[in-house]
Amino acid sequence: MDYRQLHRWDLPPEEAIKVQNELRKKIKLTPYEGEPEYVAGVDLSFPGKEEGLAVIVVLEYPSFKILEVVSERGEITFPYIPGLLAFREGPLFLKAWEKLRTKPDVVVFDGQGLAHPRKLGIASHMGLFIEIPTIGVAKSRLYGTFKMPEDKRCSWSYLYDGEEIIGCVIRTKEGSAPIFVSPGHLMDVESSKRLIKAFTLPGRRIPEPTRLAHIYTQRLKKGLF
Protein backbone atom coordinates (compact mmCIF):
# COMPACT_ATOMS: atom_id res chain seq x y z
CA MET A 1 0.00 0.00 0.00
CA ASP A 2 1.09 3.54 -0.73
CA TYR A 3 1.32 6.32 1.85
CA ARG A 4 2.19 10.00 2.05
CA GLN A 5 5.61 10.93 3.44
CA LEU A 6 4.78 13.96 5.59
CA HIS A 7 8.07 14.57 7.41
CA ARG A 8 11.49 13.22 8.33
CA TRP A 9 11.86 10.77 11.21
CA ASP A 10 15.40 11.61 12.35
CA LEU A 11 14.34 14.50 14.57
CA PRO A 12 15.25 15.44 18.14
CA PRO A 13 12.33 15.22 20.60
CA GLU A 14 11.72 18.98 20.67
CA GLU A 15 11.38 19.06 16.86
CA ALA A 16 9.14 15.98 16.93
CA ILE A 17 6.77 17.82 19.27
CA LYS A 18 6.65 20.76 16.84
CA VAL A 19 5.75 18.35 14.03
CA GLN A 20 2.93 16.91 16.14
CA ASN A 21 1.54 20.36 16.87
CA GLU A 22 1.45 21.11 13.13
CA LEU A 23 0.01 17.76 12.06
CA ARG A 24 -2.80 17.86 14.63
CA LYS A 25 -4.35 20.71 12.62
CA LYS A 26 -4.86 18.29 9.70
CA ILE A 27 -6.80 15.64 11.64
CA LYS A 28 -10.39 15.12 10.49
CA LEU A 29 -12.84 13.75 13.04
CA THR A 30 -15.71 12.54 10.88
CA PRO A 31 -18.38 9.86 11.36
CA TYR A 32 -17.70 6.46 9.82
CA GLU A 33 -20.90 5.39 8.10
CA GLY A 34 -21.86 1.78 7.53
CA GLU A 35 -19.77 -1.31 8.18
CA PRO A 36 -16.24 -2.04 6.94
CA GLU A 37 -15.50 -5.02 4.72
CA TYR A 38 -11.82 -5.30 5.66
CA VAL A 39 -10.29 -4.32 8.99
CA ALA A 40 -6.58 -4.18 9.87
CA GLY A 41 -4.94 -4.51 13.27
CA VAL A 42 -1.47 -3.16 14.04
CA ASP A 43 0.84 -4.30 16.82
CA LEU A 44 4.49 -3.50 17.52
CA SER A 45 6.89 -5.18 19.91
CA PHE A 46 10.57 -5.05 20.71
CA PRO A 47 12.46 -8.37 20.47
CA GLY A 48 15.72 -6.62 21.37
CA LYS A 49 16.83 -3.42 23.05
CA GLU A 50 17.21 -1.59 19.73
CA GLU A 51 15.11 -3.86 17.51
CA GLY A 52 11.43 -3.48 16.69
CA LEU A 53 8.85 -5.71 15.05
CA ALA A 54 5.71 -4.39 13.33
CA VAL A 55 2.83 -6.65 12.33
CA ILE A 56 -0.29 -5.79 10.33
CA VAL A 57 -3.12 -8.31 10.13
CA VAL A 58 -6.00 -7.77 7.69
CA LEU A 59 -9.30 -9.43 8.57
CA GLU A 60 -12.57 -9.90 6.76
CA TYR A 61 -15.47 -8.41 8.70
CA PRO A 62 -17.66 -9.66 10.35
CA SER A 63 -16.16 -13.17 10.10
CA PHE A 64 -12.71 -12.02 11.34
CA LYS A 65 -11.16 -14.43 8.86
CA ILE A 66 -7.47 -13.60 8.40
CA LEU A 67 -6.79 -12.50 4.82
CA GLU A 68 -3.22 -11.23 5.04
CA VAL A 69 -0.37 -10.84 7.53
CA VAL A 70 2.71 -8.70 6.88
CA SER A 71 5.59 -7.81 9.16
CA GLU A 72 8.75 -5.74 9.31
CA ARG A 73 11.67 -6.13 11.68
CA GLY A 74 14.30 -3.43 12.01
CA GLU A 75 16.43 -1.14 14.09
CA ILE A 76 14.79 1.35 16.46
CA THR A 77 16.68 4.62 16.76
CA PHE A 78 14.22 6.95 18.49
CA PRO A 79 14.17 6.76 22.32
CA TYR A 80 11.12 5.73 24.32
CA ILE A 81 9.39 9.00 25.26
CA PRO A 82 5.72 9.01 26.34
CA GLY A 83 3.68 10.98 23.81
CA LEU A 84 6.18 10.42 20.98
CA LEU A 85 5.41 6.78 20.25
CA ALA A 86 4.83 7.40 16.54
CA PHE A 87 8.41 8.55 16.07
CA ARG A 88 9.65 5.31 17.60
CA GLU A 89 7.24 2.90 15.91
CA GLY A 90 5.95 4.76 12.85
CA PRO A 91 8.83 4.03 10.44
CA LEU A 92 8.56 0.25 10.98
CA PHE A 93 4.79 0.35 10.58
CA LEU A 94 5.12 2.19 7.27
CA LYS A 95 7.66 -0.35 5.97
CA ALA A 96 5.22 -3.13 6.82
CA TRP A 97 2.39 -1.12 5.24
CA GLU A 98 4.30 -1.00 1.95
CA LYS A 99 4.12 -4.81 1.79
CA LEU A 100 0.35 -4.92 2.23
CA ARG A 101 -1.73 -5.97 -0.80
CA THR A 102 -5.22 -5.87 0.75
CA LYS A 103 -6.51 -2.36 1.40
CA PRO A 104 -8.36 -2.17 4.72
CA ASP A 105 -11.35 0.09 5.26
CA VAL A 106 -10.43 0.73 8.92
CA VAL A 107 -7.09 0.33 10.73
CA VAL A 108 -6.97 -0.31 14.49
CA PHE A 109 -3.74 0.54 16.34
CA ASP A 110 -2.52 -0.70 19.69
CA GLY A 111 -2.04 2.81 21.03
CA GLN A 112 -3.68 6.21 21.29
CA GLY A 113 -5.49 8.39 18.80
CA LEU A 114 -7.01 11.69 19.92
CA ALA A 115 -6.48 10.75 23.59
CA HIS A 116 -3.00 12.24 23.62
CA PRO A 117 -1.46 15.40 25.14
CA ARG A 118 -1.17 16.97 21.67
CA LYS A 119 -4.20 15.17 20.17
CA LEU A 120 -1.90 13.14 17.90
CA GLY A 121 -1.31 9.60 19.11
CA ILE A 122 0.09 6.95 16.77
CA ALA A 123 -3.36 6.14 15.33
CA SER A 124 -3.89 9.79 14.37
CA HIS A 125 -0.32 10.31 13.16
CA MET A 126 -0.27 7.21 10.95
CA GLY A 127 -3.80 7.95 9.78
CA LEU A 128 -2.50 11.13 8.16
CA PHE A 129 0.18 9.10 6.36
CA ILE A 130 -2.14 6.39 5.02
CA GLU A 131 -5.35 8.48 4.66
CA ILE A 132 -7.57 5.63 5.85
CA PRO A 133 -9.90 5.77 8.88
CA THR A 134 -7.98 4.82 12.03
CA ILE A 135 -8.76 4.06 15.68
CA GLY A 136 -6.48 3.88 18.69
CA VAL A 137 -7.12 1.21 21.32
CA ALA A 138 -4.93 1.30 24.42
CA LYS A 139 -4.81 -0.92 27.49
CA SER A 140 -4.10 2.03 29.78
CA ARG A 141 -4.79 5.75 29.96
CA LEU A 142 -2.19 8.14 28.60
CA TYR A 143 -4.22 11.34 28.85
CA GLY A 144 -7.64 12.56 29.94
CA THR A 145 -10.09 12.08 32.79
CA PHE A 146 -12.97 9.63 33.05
CA LYS A 147 -15.44 7.93 35.34
CA MET A 148 -14.77 4.20 35.66
CA PRO A 149 -17.46 2.21 33.80
CA GLU A 150 -19.44 -0.33 35.80
CA ASP A 151 -18.21 -3.93 35.76
CA LYS A 152 -20.55 -5.05 33.01
CA ARG A 153 -19.66 -6.00 29.44
CA CYS A 154 -20.04 -3.11 26.99
CA SER A 155 -20.54 -0.51 29.73
CA TRP A 156 -18.60 2.63 28.95
CA SER A 157 -17.89 6.25 29.81
CA TYR A 158 -16.43 9.22 27.95
CA LEU A 159 -12.79 10.26 28.21
CA TYR A 160 -12.37 14.02 28.61
CA ASP A 161 -9.76 16.71 28.13
CA GLY A 162 -11.40 19.41 30.23
CA GLU A 163 -14.90 19.58 28.74
CA GLU A 164 -13.86 18.14 25.36
CA ILE A 165 -14.69 14.50 24.68
CA ILE A 166 -11.56 12.83 23.28
CA GLY A 167 -12.49 9.16 23.47
CA CYS A 168 -14.25 6.57 25.55
CA VAL A 169 -13.45 3.94 28.15
CA ILE A 170 -15.10 0.58 27.43
CA ARG A 171 -15.47 -2.42 29.72
CA THR A 172 -15.22 -5.14 27.08
CA LYS A 173 -14.99 -8.03 29.56
CA GLU A 174 -16.47 -8.35 33.03
CA GLY A 175 -13.84 -8.60 35.74
CA SER A 176 -11.15 -7.07 33.51
CA ALA A 177 -9.77 -3.55 33.23
CA PRO A 178 -11.42 -1.38 30.55
CA ILE A 179 -9.78 -0.35 27.29
CA PHE A 180 -9.24 3.23 26.13
CA VAL A 181 -10.60 3.96 22.67
CA SER A 182 -10.11 7.16 20.69
CA PRO A 183 -10.52 8.17 17.05
CA GLY A 184 -7.39 8.54 14.98
CA HIS A 185 -8.13 10.19 11.63
CA LEU A 186 -11.23 10.16 9.39
CA MET A 187 -13.13 8.81 12.39
CA ASP A 188 -15.05 10.27 15.34
CA VAL A 189 -15.60 9.23 18.95
CA GLU A 190 -19.04 7.68 18.45
CA SER A 191 -17.97 5.70 15.38
CA SER A 192 -14.83 4.42 17.08
CA LYS A 193 -16.89 3.31 20.09
CA ARG A 194 -19.42 1.52 17.89
CA LEU A 195 -16.79 -0.25 15.81
CA ILE A 196 -14.57 -1.36 18.68
CA LYS A 197 -17.57 -2.82 20.49
CA ALA A 198 -18.39 -4.73 17.30
CA PHE A 199 -14.78 -5.88 16.86
CA THR A 200 -14.54 -7.34 20.39
CA LEU A 201 -15.88 -10.86 20.85
CA PRO A 202 -17.64 -12.01 24.04
CA GLY A 203 -15.11 -13.16 26.61
CA ARG A 204 -12.31 -11.08 25.09
CA ARG A 205 -10.88 -7.85 26.46
CA ILE A 206 -9.00 -6.79 23.30
CA PRO A 207 -10.69 -6.29 19.88
CA GLU A 208 -9.90 -8.98 17.32
CA PRO A 209 -7.78 -6.84 14.94
CA THR A 210 -5.14 -5.91 17.53
CA ARG A 211 -5.53 -9.15 19.50
CA LEU A 212 -4.64 -11.23 16.45
CA ALA A 213 -1.86 -8.84 15.42
CA HIS A 214 -0.36 -9.27 18.91
CA ILE A 215 -0.53 -13.07 18.60
CA TYR A 216 1.47 -12.88 15.38
CA THR A 217 4.09 -10.56 16.89
CA GLN A 218 4.61 -13.10 19.68
CA ARG A 219 4.88 -15.97 17.19
CA LEU A 220 7.40 -14.06 15.10
CA LYS A 221 9.48 -13.19 18.16
CA LYS A 222 9.62 -16.91 18.99
CA GLY A 223 10.31 -17.93 15.39
CA LEU A 224 7.01 -19.81 15.11
CA PHE A 225 5.66 -18.00 12.03
Swiss-Prot record:
GO terms for molecular function: deoxyribonuclease V activity; magnesium ion binding; RNA endonuclease activity, producing 5'-phosphomonoesters; single-stranded RNA binding. The keyword Nuclease applies. One of its GO terms (biological process) is DNA repair. Mg(2+) binds at residues 43, 110. Changing residue 125 to A: No effect on cleavage of DNA containing inosine. Changing residue 89 to A: Strongly reduced cleavage of DNA containing inosine. Residues 139-141, 214-221 are annotated as: Interaction with target DNA. Its cofactor is Mg(2+). Its main location: cytoplasm. The keyword Repeat does not apply. Keywords: Cytoplasm, DNA damage, DNA repair, Endonuclease, Hydrolase, Magnesium, Metal-binding, Nuclease. The record marks 80 as: Interaction with target DNA. GO terms for cellular component: cytoplasm. It is found in: Cytoplasm. Its EC number is 3.1.21.7. Signal peptide: none annotated. It holds the Pfam family Endonuclease_5. NCBIfam families: endonuc_V_Ttgales. Belongs to the endonuclease V family. HAMAP family: Endonuclease_5. PANTHER family: ENDONUCLEASE V. DNA repair enzyme involved in the repair of deaminated bases. Selectively cleaves double-stranded DNA at the second phosphodiester bond 3' to a deoxyinosine leaving behind the intact lesion on the nicked DNA. In vitro, can also cleave single-stranded substrates with inosine, double-stranded DNA with apurinic sites, or DNA sites with uracil or a mismatched base. When present in molar excess, two protein molecules can bind to the same DNA substrate and effect cleavage of both strands (in vitro). This is Endonuclease V.
